[in-house]
């Protein structure tokens, strides 16, 4: 299961991008990077393609580690129970946006906190990674004016509001408003990023 999760994670950013980051490059490497990396403007990040690929993978790794850290904080503060093995595999499945889970029930067995962490990171891993590079370089205006990202979050927010309202008005699905919004947000994040995790029918 770990190997399956790891290869899933490795392919999330693209195996070719990984290779570009660690092996000598030719003049044709720009085409590989454009084809394999998420986001249309990655080639404009820095002049050298190898540097661009390394930056993308550094961001990808840092976000994966951050998700694992939030899982472990949940265990530390008693907000949920999850093993190190499950933490790693779920983080890999979230980062790869393919939703590979080590349990048959997906994330339904985990606490609301652990599900919320997964929701946030599903959405974050669905963002164009060049935007994170711009944020790291403090080019906030360029990141903010990215129409792809703005519409991405507008669609997510709108879907959560509309679906939650529909479920609350029809009634009987979840016992509380919080649980309704919680499960809807998770499902919307899962669907829009094609991750495919589930918490409820």
Task: Name every feature range the model reports, one short phrase each.
Residues 1-201:
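Membrane-proximal intracellular helices of multi-pass ion channels
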